[in-house]
Amino acid sequence: TDSVVKELSDSEKIDKALAEGRKVVYLTYDDGPSANTEKLLDVLDQYGIKATFFVIKTPEYDEYVKEIVTRGHTLAMHSTTHDYRHVYESYDSFKEEVDVLSNYLTELTGFTPFAFRFPGGSSNQQTTLPIQTFIKYLDEKNIVYYDWNVSSGDGGSKELTVDEIYNNVISGVEGKDISVVLMHDSEYRETTLQATPRIIEKLQEMDALILPITEDTVPVHHNI
């Protein structure tokens, strides 16, 4: 008899989890790499969790970008500079923000990212041109953009407490079958790093299926 058990694809795992009434959760971290990235990767390793990192170009932390890939997480794009004025100034400036980062990450890791997250999300109010202008370029490059439907709230100017971040994430996840959770991996987001173990432990206690974004992941988009 064939004793080899076929590995389920992510989409099969998701269908099975949802049929069983379990939650499906994608943990995503924007704005890295940073001084916190290595600690965050260690926490994820500790729990056997794979996440998704939407990164910007930060040459001083090149090593961590490589680590994201070698440790089996999904490396994705968040723009080269994260400077709203430049990212959204024109079609050409947006194209440059995507191309420079894509080429940079490919050279660094050998992996060409397929996923992008708009700074501020696709519903941001910082763009003078319609967001569809920029989406059209991503479509041409076969790059998929991902927003989020659960926010940790850690992206504002005020640093939230570990409890606030934890509560924001868990209450958001509890209200949805499939959650794409927005968090930030920047060095002044220390409490996000500290909240991550508690968030993972609670999700595991809930028997949630925690996955990285892959090319098969159905994108969550804000209503444009």
PLM segments and residue spans:
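Active-site beta->alpha N-cap acidic-glycine motif
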Residues: 2-113, 202, 209, 218
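Catalytic domains of cell-wall/extracellular-matrix polysaccharide-remodeling enzymes
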Residues: 39, 84-182, 186-204, 208-209, ...
